[in-house]
Amino acid sequence: MEEDSLYLGGEWQFNHFSKLTSSRPDAAFAEIQRTSLPEKSPLSCETRVDLCDDLAPVARQLAPREKLPLSSRRPAAVGAGLQNMGNTCYVNASLQCLTYTPPLANYMLSREHSQTCHRHKGCMLCTMQAHITRALHNPGHVIQPSQALAAGFHRGKQEDAHEFLMFTVDAMKKACLPGHKQVDHHSKDTTLIHQIFGGYWRSQIKCLHCHGISDTFDPYLDIALDIQAAQSVQQALEQLVKPEELNGENAYHCGVCLQRAPASKTLTLHTSAKVLILVLKRFSDVTGNKIAKNVQYPECLDMQPYMSQTNTGPLVYVLYAVLVHAGWSCHNGHYFSYVKAQEGQWYKMDDAEVTASSITSVLSQQAYVLFYIQKSEWERHSESVSRGREPRALGAEDTDRRATQGELKRDHPCLQAPELDEHLVERATQESTLDHWKFLQEQNKTKPEFNVRKVEGTLPPDVLVIHQSKYKCGMKNHHPEQQSSLLKLSSTTPTHQESMNTGTLASLRGRARRSKGKNKHSKRALLVCQ
């Protein structure tokens, strides 16, 4: 049977029935419709994964795979802590997870983007390049994140860390497009950011009357997991890909037999990302209540059972970062993260404090966002570091010794690390705002007909989250381990967190705003380091 390929209004159709066209020509997805195929059909199950290379034909490859840095440029040791500028722990926790993402960090340290970027302002890639370079090249220090990293997002109160994370990833993806503003949506999925974090879902509907199959493909940058009925990440993934029966009022209108008939609908991962961002849905959109249950997650995760093809061998990912929310609900708490340095040692990154940790402590957290990288990618980056660096990896016997050597000396945190290059600071004013980003997210939300499981948002936009210092008693159970601090502020100098987390909150733009509720009466002056 001859295969017809048709491009319709931003949509690529692969159709075995030349007289049939999609009823949704304006949607940004690729669809395949076919009847029962013989075993040696060109589109049989054995070759379906290969089709993903053709389901999104591109007019222009924005980031050729051969241009991605292959060797690691990252220092082996852990980098700097981040100063809290007043309810910005959600920013710091997210930035640390991105900083220790090997493919992203290697690209940033190559400085390839800033050498070719022609934008004068609003480039998130330039801003992140400057931040990651400073953070990784200043171990033992505390640096102040650039105001431009949260410009347009931070509003003087604590926001949701996952929203900020994806806001930043989306801004970096858009920064890959200057000069290519007219490219089609398939070309946009060839950007550096999509090659690192992105993949494709496949939603397959099989008509139980004629056995015709319709495949819909949609890109993703993160994966949201419903944990209400799951005790582990693996269980949540199993629920996500569990087939759904469409019958009765929900019967499927088949595009092959043109009848309304019962059908089965299955969501699977069609192509895998180099880096997986798994979001555990801990917060209710309606009440803001937190699901404070322990959800088990492994150090090594095999994603093969959740792929479109399950007979191609293991697809193993290794954990390298965990973003944690500590507290009772979305209305209070504190964000911090755990990251795995290139040397293989885990560290707890809690604003300015950088503390050596163990995998046992890492796996016992009430995780909010999990970061996994393909094992082959991690090993490749680790091997290149071990060949190119002088000091050996930090072993368990070294951890305690180095952690008890006392406080590391440092000057004022704002003056310790090298300043940003002027031309990068000039570019660092972000054009997007939080409200505009949320509007675009609603506009680009996955089509209802694609979803097998509804993925709700994380936090209501008007939620006020109180910072750690006000609710220490509510978080004591989240810090069971007694770890040796590698990086502390001087005991004689009050920390910025202590002076900024109560009373009036300061935005990164330096404008004091009132907090809500019982803090309304407070008008303490705040010191914001410029």
Curated annotation (Swiss-Prot):
Belongs to the peptidase C19 family. USP17 subfamily. GO terms for molecular function: cysteine-type deubiquitinase activity. It is found in: Nucleus; Endoplasmic reticulum. It comes from Homo sapiens (Human). Keywords: Endoplasmic reticulum, Hydrolase, Nucleus, Protease, Thiol protease, Ubl conjugation pathway. Residues 382-392, 398-413 have a biased composition (Basic and acidic residues). The active site is at C89, H334. Residues 80-375 form the USP domain. It catalyses: Thiol-dependent hydrolysis of ester, thioester, amide, peptide and isopeptide bonds formed by the C-terminal Gly of ubiquitin (a 76-residue protein attached to proteins as an intracellular targeting signal). Signal peptide: none annotated. Residues 496-505 have a biased composition (Polar residues). Deubiquitinating enzyme that removes conjugated ubiquitin from specific proteins to regulate different cellular processes that may include cell proliferation, progression through the cell cycle, apoptosis, cell migration, and the cellular response to viral infection. Residues 484-495 have a biased composition (Low complexity). One of its GO terms (biological process) is protein deubiquitination. InterPro entries: HABP4_PAIRBP1-bd (IPR006861), Papain-like_cys_pep_sf (IPR038765), Peptidase_C19 (IPR050164), Peptidase_C19_UCH (IPR001394), USP_CS (IPR018200), USP_dom (IPR028889). It comes from the Eukaryota. This is Ubiquitin carboxyl-terminal hydrolase 17-like protein 19. GO terms for cellular component: cytosol; endoplasmic reticulum; nucleus.
